[in-house]
UniProtKB/Swiss-Prot annotation:
GN (gene name): alaE
Name assigned to this protein: L-alanine exporter AlaE
Principal localisation: membrane
Organism of provenance: Aliivibrio fischeri (strain ATCC 700601 / ES114) (Vibrio fischeri)
GO annotations of cellular component type: plasma membrane
GO terms of biological process kind: amino acid export across plasma membrane
Length: 150
């Protein structure tokens, strides 16, 4: 986890890349295979989600880092980090996801099913997203996530 500090362009770029890629892939999976949306509805949803994810990626990264710090105050264990990742992901992403589905014309039943399924899947997905985000931050050489070569 990075230290709290000033805005870092590498951090924002890594957070944006991670959110756009991860949410596009996992969102299509949930919408088509679990929620019963058509491919066209899902593609419209995923296309609309790209600018939304670009807009919320860095704020989510800041929120996630805050949640990880709060979890670390309770316990420094990996289990607590995973719980903090899960809580951060579900509480931040669910409202945004519901709005995207509403805009693309999903029925109320599809929205409830998709968001509910997303909450259940997030029990695993939120943790995997945390690992994916950390890997992206390392790849983008975000301070605190990589070791510079001497």
């Amino acid at each position: 986890m990075s230290k709290k500090g000033p805005f870092n362009i590498r951090n924002a770029a890594a957070d944006t890349f991670a959110m756009v890629v991860f949410c596009f892939i996992t969102g299509m999976f949930i919408e088509i295979l679990i929620s019963g949306m058509t491919f066209e509805q899902s593609l419209a949803s995923r296309t609309l989600s790209i600018p939304v994810n670009i807009a919320i990626a860095w704020p989510y990264g800041v929120f996630r880092d805050f949640m990880l710090r709060q979890g670390a105050r309770i316990s420094p264990s990996k289990f607590m980090k995973n719980i903090a990742d899960l809580v951060a992901y579900v509480t931040f992403q669910s409202p945004a996801y519901a709005m995207i589905l509403l805009v693309v014309g999903a029925t109320p039943e599809q929205i409830i099913t998709a968001v509910s399924s997303n909450v259940v899947v997030s029990c695993v997905m939120g943790v995997f997203y945390g690992y994916f985000l950390d890997a992206c931050r390392k790849a983008f050489k975000v301070p605190g996530y990589y070791t510079p070569q001497a």
